[in-house]
Swiss-Prot record:
Keywords: Cell membrane, Iron, Membrane, Metal-binding, Monooxygenase, Oxidoreductase, Ubiquinone biosynthesis
Lineage: Bacteria, Pseudomonadati, Pseudomonadota, Betaproteobacteria, Rhodocyclales
Name of the molecule in the record: 3-demethoxyubiquinol 3-hydroxylase
Catalytic activity: a 5-methoxy-2-methyl-3-(all-trans-polyprenyl)benzene-1,4-diol + AH2 + O2 = a 3-demethylubiquinol + A + H2O
Species name: Azoarcus sp. (strain BH72)
Family: Belongs to the COQ7 family.
Its membrane topology: Peripheral membrane protein
Required cofactor(s): Fe cation
Amino acid sequence: MFDKAIIEFDKALRTVFAPARSVRPVPGDDVPDAPLDDEQKRHAAALMRVNHVGEICAQALYQGQAIMSGDERVREELQRASHEETEHLAWTEQRIAELGGRKSLLNPLWYGGALAIGMLAGRFGDRWNLGFLAETERQVEAHLTSHLERLPADDRKSRAIVEQMRTDEVEHAETALKLGGRELPLPVRSAMKLASRVMTTAAYRV
């Protein structure tokens, strides 16, 4: 039990503080940088910071859910999704730096809150656990779609990253439902949307 706690704590430290690494090529890495003005760069960096925070939260959610799951198949799916989210973390981190931005100062807070929510979701059983995963991915997909509408049209690098992230999130949601995830009640989905709105608003600025 103590060894497991050390492993989970190490995951948290690496997610929040260590540079993320990607196995897959970074989407748009071969696309030349567009000549964006200072305001466009600031805006794009802020949107990518929001996406980076979303991936921090995803790592914590999946970690919390995996800790509480009693089904090896569910844990494996959570770990697979987590690995892809780590790549998203690396992509957004790189793009933020290229745009001259910075990561959120509140990342430890986002991580801690999402970990607690993930563990709480896991306590309700694997079907609800998977349903929570599916709904999370749907909401992330929706907010990534909105970012494609808000990013500067010429920022093809950021757009390529967001498009690939969205594709991955759709796949995660579909897999969770195929594994038996249940649709969450409307009040729960609404509460998740409200929490997401608070996070995205704060992360855009801080």
